């Protein structure tokens, strides 16, 4: 939708326009970081357009909170590292931006894995590459680097991220398959696909593409076969907060 102060955004289109430090693109995951990026914008001695992606689902999210101290001290964090894990125990680093972080965080708490670090990219452009590479050096035992996004593979930030990091780390994507439209058109299909992304990040999926680059080809766009599978599992109303918990989709 569109209103007096906002419009629906296509992240990949804004990122295509980024060059020569012409604009700033941010996707904040905490109230304090949102506050500080606005504060920084006004405080700076120069003016460059600031694009901020702010999904409505985080407005009242129980995990999306900041303390008063977070507002009154510090500044905008271009990258937020995972402080809940021991770097030497991590063998997989997942990079992401935006609200999908909270879905992965919820699953990470359930799994209590301890071997997966989730790093949030809060500023997409200018991309803080040196800062990110410095953070990644902490994870010396990590060989698997993932970019996780809920958008289709040809949308979102994936292609932008890949072009920046491909020469430095071997990174692969977990996302929806490439699509001509940003939405599936089916709420059931959307929820299953969303959970499938989380399952693949935490290796709960036994798809043969699990250890390869995943663009959810195991589901694809096979609407009829998908609807039949839903009927086989007697799935009528799907709770987005629950796992699909069924046989792997084919």
Predicted regions and their residues:
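Thiamine diphosphate
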Residues: 1-10, 44-47, 59-248
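Conserved thiamine diphosphate
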Residues: 1-44
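Generic detector of short, locally flexible boundary/turn motifs and exposed helical patches
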Residues: 15-19, 55-56, 109-114
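General beta-strand structural signal in soluble alpha/beta enzymes
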Residues: 25-29, 52-54, 147
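Short acidic/polar capping segments at secondary-structure boundaries
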Residues: 31-33, 56-58, 99
């Amino acid at each position: 939708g569109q209103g007096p102060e906002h419009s629906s955004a296509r992240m990949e289109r804004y990122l295509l326009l980024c060059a020569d430090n012409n604009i700033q693109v941010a996707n904040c995951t905490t109230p304090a970081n949102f506050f500080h990026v606005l504060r920084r914008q006004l405080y700076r001695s120069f003016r460059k357009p600031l694009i901020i992606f702010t999904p409505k689902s985080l407005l009242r999210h129980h995990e999306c909170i900041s303390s008063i101290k977070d507002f009154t001290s510090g500044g905008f964090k271009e990258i937020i590292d995972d402080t809940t894990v021991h770097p030497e125990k991590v063998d997989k680093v997942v990079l992401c931006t935006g609200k999908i972080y909270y879905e992965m965080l919820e699953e990470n708490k359930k799994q209590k894995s301890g071997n997966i670090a989730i790093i949030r990219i809060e500023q997409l452009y200018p991309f803080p590459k040196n800062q990110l590479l410095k953070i990644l050096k902490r994870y010396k035992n990590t060989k698997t680097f993932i970019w996780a996004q809920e958008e289709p593979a040809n949308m979102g930030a994936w292609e932008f991220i890949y072009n920046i990091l491909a020469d430095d780390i071997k990174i692969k994507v977990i996302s929806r398959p490439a699509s001509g439209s940003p939405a599936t058109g089916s709420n059931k299909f959307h929820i299953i696909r969303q959970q499938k992304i989380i399952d693949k990040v935490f290796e709960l999926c036994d798809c043969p593409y699990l250890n390869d680059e995943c663009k959810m080809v195991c589901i694809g766009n096979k609407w009829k076969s998908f609807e039949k599978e839903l009927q086989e599992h007697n799935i009528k109303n799907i709770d987005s907060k629950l796992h699909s918990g069924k046989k792997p989709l084919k």
